[in-house]
Each structure stands twice: as structure tokens, then as C-alpha cells.
């Protein structure tokens, strides 16, 4: 396993992985917001008990 880090710079690899996961999270949230079922910003108002 240590030979893998000899091929790739750990700093650049972890920064690239973090950026990828952040963008993936944004994409997933925007896809959820575009649906009627999972849009928590413009959803139906809460029913009072």
C-alpha cells in the first residue's frame, strides 16, 4: 500500500478527493431540491396539531 503513495502526492490526492466529494454532495442536494417530494425549501407548510 505504501508504494501507491510513492506514485501519487498525498496532498494533491486528498485535496482532489475532498473537492470531488464536495461537488458530488452539491449535485445530490440540487437534484433533491429539483423534485417535488424532497424539496424542503418550497415544500408544503407544516400542519398544526
Curated annotation (Swiss-Prot):
Keyword ATP-binding among record annotations: no
Membrane topology per record: Single-pass type II membrane protein
Side of membrane Cytoplasmic, spans: 1-12
Superkingdom of the source species: Bacteria
Gene3D superfamilies: Light-harvesting complex
One GO-annotated biological process of the protein: photosynthesis, light reaction
Family (UniProt): Belongs to the antenna complex alpha subunit family.
Function per UniProt: Antenna complexes are light-harvesting systems, which transfer the excitation energy to the reaction centers.
UniProt-recorded name of the protein: Light-harvesting protein B-880 alpha chain
Organism: Rhodoblastus acidophilus (Rhodopseudomonas acidophila)
Amino acid at each position: 500500500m505504501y508504494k501507491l503513495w510513492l506514485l501519487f502526492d498525498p496532498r494533491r490526492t486528498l485535496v482532489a478527493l475532498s473537492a470531488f466529494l464536495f461537488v458530488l454532495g452539491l449535485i445530490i442536494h440540487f437534484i433533491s431540491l429539483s423534485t417535488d417530494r424532497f424539496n424542503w425549501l418550497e415544500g408544503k407548510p407544516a400542519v398544526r396539531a
